[in-house]
Amino acid sequence: METIPITVSGAKFLEDELLRLKDEERPRIVNDIATAREHGDLKENAEYHAAKEEQAFVEGRIQEIESKLSRLQIIDVKQLNQDGRCVFGTTVSLLNLSDDSEIIYQIVGEDEADIEKGKISCHSPIARALMGNEEGEEVTVNAPKGDIRYEILDVQYL
């Protein structure tokens, strides 16, 4: 079974989502189904069908999270050898060498990736180019719109 790399905060987020789904969403949906059943004929009961559809979605998500939690490889970046190398979990400051713009990314697992929050998947082209390199080095990212060159300004183990 393949392990899934994730940061400590990413694992906590999944655990919190699982608790919310089990403790809040599941009971609410069961109640919605019971209420909809009281309205009579189930064949034409839109509320009942909507609640059953939502139940299927929530149960599927619960199973997905439970499966992932059993395969997580939780990586506490603060415990890693802080040698200035870009590795999973590090926060990396970059200088785009074509336009001198600076950007900061944290390299995280698939479930944590959120480009708007500066969190990029460890499988993304940028992360793959950065991994193993260190402060002061230049990397080339093979992006869909062409190659982009970056200088690694700083690597933080937050």
Give residue ranges: language-model regions:
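Amphipathic alpha-helical coiled-coil segments
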Residues: 59-73
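Conserved NTP-handling cores and scaffolds of large molecular machines
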Residues: 18, 22-25, 69-73, 134
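Residue-level signal for pocket-adjacent positions within structured domains
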Residues: 1, 16, 37, 43, ...
